[in-house]
């Protein structure tokens, strides 16, 4: 009995010593974490060019389509993907499209018919929006927010989507199912289309409706895509809007993350304007942001 008690005492002493040693070991500071993250991002930037100027058509992929390929599992029914494309468009009906006099007429033929607009399910409405003929216009402005406000003004599909209470749910499900390799192989503008989907998710109506669970699901999906992009030296995708989506979704849903951001004018500017100036965000703040996402 005495021998057993002695063993127990020894185990307790060893456990206490291990715990004390763990406390004594220097923990990596937020600033150190931030410096490391900044270094890795700089390395990524030198390897990857931003596909801001990606051509409207990927000439190297003759099998890709101009319409949005619906990811498997998004709809609970089989459907003709092209039903969500305007009857007049630059690829199917180039002569009719080229005959349009100006951008006003292009926008007019690109609207969703009124009888469909109010009766279509939100899941399918999202697909109409993904196929908007002029969706790339959102990239022609100084900020993504300004670009999406322009698309909202020009396109009835986006305006209707922003009124749907389940819009966030549909967009998040589509985003989670958006496989980078598969979509790029099938979609002639897959990289820009991902940015467009992320830009929709960043619209105020969507962000303001997010639950904490939805925000965390988005952050996890963003992290998965970011990891794949930065670890693929030949990836045609950019992480810029993906990073922004992860940040603004957490800012909208988490008081803890909002507190970290609000303590830094540079980080707050990034959230509010979508403008990232790395030198305006300290290593300490960057480290706190990275640590926050690692602990999700």
Label for each model-derived stretch:
Residues 1-12:
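N-terminal Sec-pathway targeting helices
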Residues 4-5, 29-30, 59:
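Residue-level detector of intrinsically disordered/flexible regions characterized by low predicted structural confidence
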Residues 11-20:
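Hydrophobic membrane-insertion alpha-helices, especially the h-region
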Residues 20-37:
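Sec-dependent signal peptide cleavage junction
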Residues 38-40, 47, 58, 66, ...:
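Non-catalytic all-alpha helical scaffold/repeat segments
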């Amino acid at each position: 009995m005495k021998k057993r008690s002695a063993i127990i005492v020894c185990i307790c002493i060893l456990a206490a010593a291990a715990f004390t040693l763990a406390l004594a070991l220097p923990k990596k500071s937020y600033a150190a974490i931030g410096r490391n993250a900044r270094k890795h991002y700089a390395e990524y930037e030198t390897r990857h060019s931003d596909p801001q100027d990606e051509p409207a058509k990927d000439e190297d992929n003759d099998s890709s389509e101009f319409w949005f390929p619906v990811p498997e599992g998004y709809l609970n029914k089989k459907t003709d993907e092209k039903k969500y494309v305007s009857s007049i468009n630059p690829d199917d009906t180039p002569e009719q499209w080229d005959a349009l006099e100006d951008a006003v007429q292009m926008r007019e033929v690109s609207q969703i018919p009124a009888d469909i607009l109010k009766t279509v399910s939100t899941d399918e409405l999202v697909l109409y929006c993904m196929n908007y003929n002029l969706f790339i216009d959102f990239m022609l402005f100084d900020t993504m927010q300004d670009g999406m406000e322009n698309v909202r003004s020009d396109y009835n599909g986006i305006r209707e989507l922003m009124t749907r209470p389940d819009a966030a749910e549909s967009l998040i499900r589509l985003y989670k199912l958006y496989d980078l390799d598969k979509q790029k192989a099938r979609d002639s503008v897959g990289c820009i289309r991902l940015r467009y989907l992320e830009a929709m998710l960043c619209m105020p109506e969507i962000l303001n409706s997010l639950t904490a669970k939805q925000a965390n699901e988005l952050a996890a999906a963003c992290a998965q895509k970011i990891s794949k992009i930065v670890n693929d030296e030949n990836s045609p995708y950019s992480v810029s809007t993906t990073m922004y989506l992860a940040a603004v979704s957490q800012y909208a849903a988490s008081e803890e993350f909002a507190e970290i951001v609000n303590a830094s004018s540079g980080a707050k500017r990034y959230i509010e304007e979508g403008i990232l100036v790395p030198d305006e965000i300290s290593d300490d703040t960057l480290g706190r942001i990275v640590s926050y996402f690692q602990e999700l």
